[in-house]
Every structure is written in structure tokens, then in C-alpha cells.
């Protein structure tokens, strides 16, 4: 297989480059978690409590995110509601 890779000009990615790519992904993930407001988990719990009073929902289905658009912070809530 290595001979075919050599003949076809395909090179394996060096371990240093692979480690660098993995580290960049890890850092990006940590930065995105760190930028989330501290109050978001508590807000999620409270929103779930209010919705659960009226409808039976799967708590894992609720997704809350805060994004910035046009200079404003936007709270986005995604939830699949059951059929009646």
C-alpha cells in the first residue's frame, strides 16, 4: 500500500501536523464553551421547568445558544414539541 501511495504521490500526514490540527480543534471547542454566559445553564433549567408545566418534553432535545447578529445578542431556543 505504501508503494502505491508513493507512486500516486499521496503522502501521509505527518504526526506533527496531525497533532497541530487536533490541538486547534480542541482549543476552538474550549473557547466556544468559555464564551458562553455563566447564567446559561441555570436559564436552561428554568426554561425547561416552565415548558414542562404545559407539555411533556425530552430535556435532551432543548438547545439554547446565544449568538451575535448585527451588534445584538440573540437568544436562540430550539425544541421539538410533541404532537398533542
UniProtKB/Swiss-Prot annotation:
Source domain of life: Bacteria
Keyword Glycosyltransferase listed: no
SUPFAM superfamilies: Cell division protein MinE topological specificity domain
Keywords on record: Cell cycle, Cell division
A Pfam family annotated for this UniProt entry: MinE
Coiled-coil regions listed in the entry: none
InterPro entries membership: MinE (IPR005527), MinE_sf (IPR036707)
A biological process from GO: regulation of division septum assembly
Family listed: Belongs to the MinE family.
Role description: Prevents the cell division inhibition by proteins MinC and MinD at internal division sites while permitting inhibition at polar sites. This ensures cell division at the proper site by restricting the formation of a division septum at the midpoint of the long axis of the cell.
Protein name listed in UniProt: Cell division topological specificity factor
Organism: Hydrogenovibrio crunogenus (strain DSM 25203 / XCL-2)
Gene from which this protein is expressed: minE
Amino acid at each position: 500500500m505504501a508503494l502505491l501511495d508513493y507512486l500516486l504521490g499521496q503522502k501521509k500526514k505527518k504526526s506533527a501536523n496531525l497533532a497541530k490540527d487536533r490541538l486547534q480543534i480542541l482549543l476552538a471547542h474550549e473557547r466556544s464553551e468559555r464564551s458562553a454566559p455563566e447564567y446559561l445553564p441555570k436559564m436552561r433549567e428554568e426554561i425547561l421547568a416552565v415548558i414542562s408545566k404545559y407539555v411533556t418534553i425530552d430535556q435532551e432535545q432543548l438547545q439554547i445558544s446565544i449568538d451575535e447578529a448585527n451588534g445584538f445578542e440573540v437568544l436562540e431556543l430550539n425544541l421539538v414539541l410533541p404532537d398533542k
